[in-house]
Amino acid sequence: MSALDWLTKQPIAHRGLHDLNQQRWENTLPAFDAAAKAGFAIECDVHLTSDGGVVVFHDDDLQRLAGREGRISELTLAQATALHIGGTTDRAPTLREMLDLVDGRVPLVVELKGIEGRDEGLVAAVAAQLRSYKGKAAIMSFDHHLIRRFSTDAAGIPAGLTAEGTRIENFEAHFSMLAHGISFVSYNVHHLPNPFIRFVREKLHMPTISWTVRDAETQRHSDLNVDQITFEGFDPRALVA
């Protein structure tokens, strides 16, 4: 058994178990609570605010989620958490609020969203909060400049590479990240299979997950190539049943 078996034990709800039919928006406390109650692991996204806080929010631009101009990275933590998501009463939560809500009920995968030159301290800030968290949690990122800080600023916390691409230069860049202490990989499901995933899974025995699976057919494809899915918009348990 691997020390990271918990990471792939159950399907991972992408940005929580969001459902616009119920006005439950992504990366909100209701979406995270719904995922935990359903027994799904949770993926969420975090940004660094202008005053060094950590807010749970996917986009840098505010328009899609908050309906206003501006960037999340330009706001203070107080300003960011005052944003109402999708016109609802739900606010953008802090990472601490999210951790307190989930409270170890299910595993967490926290994706760090970097903006090079404006994210100094993000890795350390997230790591500090996760070190005091009693539940299972991991971090990951697309951003190579952040991944290079994982082994120092987030030592001891399971860390992964979020990746995509099917070209040789993509794989070369991904392989270069193996020197920075990553312990799992999350890959675009539509770019599977590929030599990089095959190598880390079969030769390095790293846990592998896919993103983002939205139907049973794609789930079947993912199951042939990686250990677990990150999903949204359907119930992956139906295929198992």
Q: Residue spans of the language-model regions?
A:
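Phosphate-group recognition and catalysis centered on beta-loop-alpha active-site segments
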Residues: 1-241
